[in-house]
């Protein structure tokens, strides 16, 4: 019985160097079906439509128009479009949803674990997220209060669970941690192409979150300099395992100069 739908949204994924192509392929590997909300004027939608055509019957695409995108504001904009995909999956009749962001990849070792987890019929399942920094092969190693985003996120839940806030997690009444260590999501968002990072952060902070001013550290270097935020000698460490296979080629082309 088909019971697990993967969901994802992406807007202008090419412009801001999201690994959305790999993320969609990742969901196809372990989900029964995938719903993608996509848009933008940079070829993102066309690519998603193309991969949907190649996987006929397994992907539904919801078009995000420019007017719809600009009609939402604040960090809740992210959960709004995430929920567009989740609500569509709900209408299709799926029991569970795995929500992945367009700059994330699930490790292939976790595919079977996710399928195992949903057989236990819990409402939701906490997942581990590895936040990469400076290099696709290094991860942040600082206290949670210093991290730019969480290392535990709720992304697997019954289809009634909706995204909230800045879409970091789903909302649920109950959550199990029984599978947390084995469901591993790699966050590539801070290791995009170095010449894209500055504009990406400004776009997110100003155009999405609605901040009056973006982080002033961005003006201290022409190219994004990750060392301005975290000391490479003390604040990062090597990842604990090889990167997910689907992202290895992408990662090899994104090693920073400094």
What kind of feature is each model-predicted range?
Residues 75-86, 105-258:
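Catalytic-site signature of metal-activated, phosphate-bearing donor transferases
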Residues 2-8, 27, 32-37, 185:
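Hydrophobic targeting segments
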Residues 31, 94, 102, 121-122:
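Short, well-ordered alpha-helix to beta-strand connector turns
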Residues 8-16, 33-44, 239, 245-251, ...:
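Glycosyltransferases that elongate glycans
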Residues 22-23, 47, 112-116:
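A short acidic, amphipathic alpha-helical/loop segment
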Residues 28, 49-54, 115-120:
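Short, surface-exposed basic-aromatic patches at helix termini and helix-loop junctions that form
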Residues 4-11, 19, 37-99:
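Active-site-proximal specificity loops/subdomain of glycosyltransferases
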């Amino acid at each position: 019985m088909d019971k697990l739908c993967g969901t994802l949204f992406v807007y202008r994924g090419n412009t801001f160097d999201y690994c959305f192509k790999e993320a969609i392929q990742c969901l196809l590997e372990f989900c029964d079906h995938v719903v993608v909300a996509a848009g933008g004027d940079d070829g993102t939608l066309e690519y998603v439509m193309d991969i949907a055509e190649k996987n006929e019957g397994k992907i539904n695409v919801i078009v995000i128009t420019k007017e719809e995108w600009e009609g939402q504001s604040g960090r809740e904009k992210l959960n709004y479009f995430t929920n567009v995909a989740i609500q569509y999956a709900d209408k299709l009749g799926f029991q569970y949803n795995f929500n992945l962001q367009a700059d994330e990849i699930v490790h292939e070792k976790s595919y079977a674990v996710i399928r195992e987890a949903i057989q236990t019929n819990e409402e939701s399942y906490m997942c581990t997220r590895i936040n990469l920094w400076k290099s696709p092969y290094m991860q942040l190693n600082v206290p949670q209060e210093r991290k730019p985003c969480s290392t535990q996120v709720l992304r697997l839940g019954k289809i009634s669970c909706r995204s909230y806030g800045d879409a970091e997690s789903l909302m649920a009444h109950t959550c199990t941690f029984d599978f947390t260590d084995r469901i591993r999501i790699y966050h590539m968002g801070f290791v995009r192409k170095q010449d894209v990072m500055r504009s990406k952060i400004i776009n997110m902070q100003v155009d999405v979150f609605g901040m009056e001013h973006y982080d002033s550290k961005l003006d201290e270097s022409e190219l994004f300099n990750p060392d301005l935020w975290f000391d490479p000698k003390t604040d990062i460490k090597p990842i604990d395992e090889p990167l997910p296979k689907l992202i290895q080629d992408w990662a090899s082309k994104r090693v920073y100069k400094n």
